[in-house]
Amino acid sequence: MRKVIGIGETVLDIIFKDNKPVEAVPGGSTFNAIISLGRCGVNASFISEAGNDRVGDYIIKFLRENGVNADNVSTFPDSKSPVSLAFLNTKNDAEYIFYKDHPHDQLEFTYPDIQPDDIVIFSSYYAVNPVIRPQVLGLLDYARSHGAIIYYDVNYRPAHKDDVIRITPNLLENLDYADIVRGSNEDFATLYKKDEADKVYNAEISFYCKQFIYTQGSQPVEVRGGKDFKKSYPVHNTSIVSTIGAGDNFNAGFIFGMLKYGITRDDLLRGLTEEQWDKAINCGLNFSADCCKDIFNYVSREFGEQMKG
C-alpha cells in the first residue's frame, strides 16, 4: 500500500466571524491535507514539532484519532504551540495574523520508511525556513533517492513578503526537487509580482518542474504539463462557510487521486495524460468543495467514509 508522508508546521487556528471567535481547530497547511487523507483511509504520517503544552498534546491526539501516524511529531521542553487568528470576511475568505516563533523552530525525526511511488508533501514558510533547512532538505534528498513523488505546495503568505530574497535559494531548490508544484495566484503575486498562470509557469517554474497547478480561489484551476498540456478546470459551485482549508484539501484530493488511479513517478516524468489530469484534478476539487462546506480545515468524516468505499 502506497504511503503519504507530510512535513510541516502545527498551528492552532482560532477562527473569527464578525470579529468574534467561533471555533478553534488544529491546523497547518500540510497538517490539514494529511488529516483529510487519514480520514479517507490513506496510510499517512506526519513529521513536525508540537508545543510542549495542552495545545500540542491535543494536536498529537487529533492526528492519531484521524488515523495519522504521529510518531515523528516531536515536542521540546521550551516549545510553545503557535497560534493563528483567521478572520473570515463577507465572502468567507480568511485574513490571517500569525503568532509563531520561526527563529526557534526545531525539527528532529527518524527517516520514515519510504518506497518508490510513495508521496511526500511539504509546503508554506516551513518548506523554506532557513532554521530547519538542513532537516527538510535531508528528507527531500532521502525521498528522492527512494523513488518517492514529491508534491510541493508553495503557499507563501504575504506576511513573509519581506523575506523573499532571503528564502529564494531554498525556494528554487524546492522547485527543483518537486515532481508537482502547486501554488495560488496570491503566492506568486507575493513572490514574483506575477498574476497569470502562463507568466508564472514560463518564467519561474517550468525550468525546474514541468507539472504545475495554479489555483485562484473561485476562478478556474490552471494546469500546465510541459509544452504539450494546458487546461483550465472550473471550480465546483458549493455553499461556502470557510475557505481556510480549500487549497490544503485540494492538495489532499489530488494526492488521493494519484493513489486511486495509480499515477506513478514514471507517469509524472513522462507527463500525465489528459485523462490522468482530469481524474486527479476532479478529486482535488471534490475535497476542496467538501472542506469549504464547514468551519473546519479538513474534509468531513462522512466524506472520508465515502472515499474509503
State where each predicted segment sits.
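Active-site metal-binding loops of divalent metal-dependent hydrolases
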Residues: 10, 29, 125, 154, ...
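Glycine-rich phosphate/adenosyl-contacting loop at the front of the ribokinase-like
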Residues: 1-69
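Conserved beta-alpha-beta core of the PfkB/ribokinase-like small-molecule kinase fold
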Residues: 128-199, 219-220
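Conserved phosphate-binding/catalytic region of the ribokinase-like
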Residues: 2, 195-309
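Conserved N-terminal subdomain of the carbohydrate kinase-like
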Residues: 43-124, 307-309
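Anion (oxyanion) recognition and catalysis
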Residues: 38, 64, 141-145, 175, ...
